[in-house]
Structures are given as C-alpha cells and as structure tokens.
Amino acid sequence: MDPARIDAEFPAPSYRGAQEAALDRIREAFEAGNDVVLVRAPTGSGKSLLARAIAGCARRAGEAEPHQPVGAYYTTPQVSQLDDVAADSLLDDLSIIRGKSNYDCILPGESNTPVDEAPCARERGFDCPVEHRCPYFSDRAIASNRSIAAMTLAYFMRTAGSDVFGRRDVVVVDEAHGLAEWAEMYATIELTPGRVPTAVWETTPPPAVNGLRDATAYAERLAAASDRRLTELRAKAELEREEVAERDRLTELIRELGWFVEDLRDEDSTTTWVVDQPDGAGTAVVIKPMDPARYLHHTVWDRGARFALLSATILDKAAFCRASGLNPADVALVDVPHTFPVERRPLYDTTRGKMTYEHRDETVPEVARLIVRLMANHPDEKGLVHAHSYAIAERLRDHLDRFGVGSRVRSHDSESRDAALSAWKRSSGADVFVSVRMEEALDLEGDRCRWQVLCKAPYPNTRDSRVARRLADDQWGWYYRSALRTVIQACGRVVRAPHDYRGTHPAGSSRPGPFERARPDMPGWVADPVAPPAAPGPPALGPDAALGGDHSDDPGGGGGAGGRSDRGGSSSGRFDRSGSDTQDPSDHPLSDVWGE
C-alpha cells in the first residue's frame, strides 16, 4: 500500500467539508504502520469518496513481487449502498459483482431464470455455449481482474477461500459499525423446517436440546443425514429447480454445521455459542455465536493486508476491536468533524411516554397525536416515522386512520418494504412513511424527507438469547451503545447536505437513556444537537392542516405501495365527529384547532 497516493486517488474534482483534512489524517495513520484504520465520519462527509481514495492506494500489479497481494476490495453490508455506488459516476471504476440470483440466464427459453437456477446449475456436466457472455460470470471475471472489486459484505464473506477472489492488498469496509453483528447473523445456524430441506428434517427431527452438548450431537447427526441426501441429488443427471435449491442449501448447511462443531471443539476459539429451542423436542433449534472473532478472521481479516473501516457510529474503539477480534495496538481511529450547522439538524425533546410493551397501550395513541401535529406543521413536506417493529407500525396506522389522516400515510410489510420505500421516495407529494428497521443506508436528501419521528429508543431485544447473555455478563455499555448507534444512524438519514434542514423527534420517554448512559462514547457532533428545545406546539391551522391539500401524485394517495388509505377515517380525511368513532372528540389531536 502506498498511502502517499491518497490525494491523487480522490475521485472528485474538489474537496468538500473536511474531506481534505480527513485524507491527510488517514494517510498519516497508515504511514504510522497501523494495519487497520477506523474512520469515524458523519453523514454527508462523503465516506464513499474517502473509501475510493483509500482503495486507490493499494499495491499495483507492476509494483508487486509474485507473493505479494495487489488491488483492493470495497464492501458494504447494505445492498442499497452498493446500488448508490453503482449509480455514482465518480465511482465508475469500481467493478461491481453481485450474487448469482441477481442475474438472469441468457440461454434461449431461460430469460426469466436466475443464474443460480439455470441449466448450468441443474444439469450435471452442462457445458454452457455462452458462458463467456453470461452476465454473472462476465461481471465476476471483470471484478476479479480489476484493481477495485466492489460487492456486498455477504458476498465477500461467502467467497472466503475462493480462488477467484483471493487475498488483496487493501480491504475497505463501508458502514462497518455493525461488522461483528453482521458476522453473528451470517454465522447463525437456523435448524427449522423452512431452512432444513424436508427430506432431511422429517428423517432427522430435533430432539430436546438442552445445551451445547445436545446441540453438538444433533449437529453431527444432521450433517450426516444432509450428506446422504446431497449424495443422492448429485447422482442425478438433471435436477428440477426445487432440487437445485435443496442441493445448494444442503451444501451450505453441511458447511455451517461443520464450522460450528469445529469451532466449539477448538480450545483456542474465543467464540461463545448459545442455543435456543423454546418449544421443545421436534421444533426449531437456533445456534448463535457471540463475538465471532474466528469467523471474522476467516471471512474478513485473512482477505487483506491493510484495512479501512468507515462508519459514523464506531463509538468505542476498544469495544469494537474486542468484538471484531482486532488488536487495538494495530488499530488507529480517525475522527472526521461534522461540517453541517447544528441548527440545521436539531433533535427535539418530544417524548410522549414509555414504549415498553406494558405501556404501549397508553403511549402509542400519544405518539400518533404527535405525528398528526407534525403533519400539520409540515403540510407540504414528507415525513418518516421509525416504528421499530411491525406491531407498533400497525397500531400507529390504526390510530392515524382513526384520526382521519390515513390518506397521507404509507407503510409496508416485510415483503413490500423495498417497493413501498421506492414508491414513497419517487412521489412528489407530502406523504408520511411509517417504516420498520430503515435507520440505515437511506439517502433522503432534499425534499425526499423533511422531518422524522423515532417512536422508541432502539434498544436490542432482551428476549434474544445473545442479548440476554451479554446483559447477564454485565455488558450494559454494549447495550446502550447499540441503541445510541441506531439513533445516530436514523438522524443521518435525513440531513444529507449542509443546506438541508431536518428535525428529528424522539417519541419514547426512554430516549434520554442511550444519550446519557453512552455519553462518554458520543462524538461531539452527535452531542451538539442533543439539546432540549421546546417541542413545537400545535399549529393554529384549520382541521385540514395535517392533510396539507394535494399530498400525493399517486391516484390512490396513501394507498400507494404499502399504503392502506381504504382503512379507518372517512373518505374526506377528516375526523368523524358524528359519533362513529368511539374516541372523545375533545381528545383528538386537532381538537384545539376546532375549539372543542
């Protein structure tokens, strides 16, 4: 790696904000001999451009000895982030490769067949006459030979040990704050009827699993049964599409189970495993790793010589290194200052009550009233509501419909989230999007969104066995940092440029928790807007204020992708004051406007 090239490799024609100073500090960190540089850069600092400059410093083929790695990887956990890279003309020299399922076969009669189900995957010994033109293998060949290959973190991890994507000189991971959590997710083994092929599940059902010894014994039996079924499938000359999927899943399952058993028996492994089987014998078993440093070494740290990890929310260097299996002595942290004026990214104290499960009946209606008032304050501007869970989102939609503003509200389910988000972003109206788990990798610059509500402090779910185990081990710092990290990520969705102005409105009364308890880990640019200005009061507007007139360019208004405008409130969008709604009209969020 030649860090001195970092300025020349910066892809933009000029610097913005603190980019030039950031590159200087990154160069100094690598020149000081650090193998890993953490770059804590806030939203709007141009992390992708910084990442490209770092990747460009990788050793080149003409400069290397035969045994030395060359080139760079750029990887990110978020598919949408990779899409943004693909669409950015400043990053067009990154060669992007995606998984096989993202490409269609080009053989006659197979144009709607994903490559992972094409004849080359179905037929033994199939010799594809157009492999040189296959979109997947073409992209893979180009990416493997170009100086910077770009891919999702999932694809990057799956190709560990690959002859095609071997070790490179530099690895750049964007949105790297959740690296350990992503590794835990990828390394989790779900032994359920939906994940274990039926032929194996029915012949080898789970016994009662009470601890790791039982889990290991079952894993070995299941791996043996899976291997027998895989041998049967491989003996066939041609497979049906369903059998192709079964074969691939069995191959993956055998590898996962083998990794678990091997790691568990490795006396030097630092990974702790937990096992869940809440419903007893014959039901699903989930095997989860905690702090899977060994898994990360195989899938990430062995893939490069130098690493740059970029994120706005790497809050504690020591904790990040501990969770990721890094030696803090080999790691430098570079802080990039925020250059957006703090008055343009305020965080208002608009808490309405506790959002814990036992208090939700009282608090959700209050949060809905807050949303209606904010809709009235922003009659011509889009808003985003982070509901934290689908259950909360559903209840919010019910209350917003009951308040008569449902025609301005959109939502989604687990299947429609991408389509619903895309439709909302494209719309030119002022609809409000009630979302679940969209705190990361969203770019809502400009009129795409002007205000947002955080319904609940996003603490990790204590019913998750990994979370419970960490809290039992007194890892409360991790717990509060996780919530703070999610809040910071959410705030970064809506203020994307210095001229933007967005307000963020936490609604759950536990909001001070992550800010106060994780304050020592809070960057200054995060602490600055955490001031308690008075919540905006209800506007002195008419009853139509929250609907804001023409609020959507779709014929169905809020009934666009994920919308439900046919539910709840009246067709006019007004609160039904005839008595058909059981709520007292005086308790309606716009009752002060009507004078009732």
Language model regions located:
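Conserved coupling segment at the C-terminus of the helicase ATP-binding
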Residues: 2-11, 15, 21-26, 30-43, ...
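Conserved SF1/SF2 helicase motif Ia
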Residues: 33-40, 50-91
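Structural recognition of the conserved hydrophobic beta-strand(s) that form the central parallel beta-sheet
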Residues: 72-76, 149-152, 172-173, 306-311, ...
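Conserved helicase motor
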Residues: 98-103, 153-155, 387-391, 408-422, ...
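Conserved RecA-like ASCE ATPase "motif II neighborhood" in helicase/translocase motors
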Residues: 127-169, 434-439
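Conserved motor-coupling elements within RecA-like helicase/translocase cores
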Residues: 137-147, 404-433
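Conserved RecA-like P-loop NTPase helicase motor core
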Residues: 351-360, 416-511
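Helicase C-terminal subdomain and adjacent C-terminal extension
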Residues: 459-488, 497-596
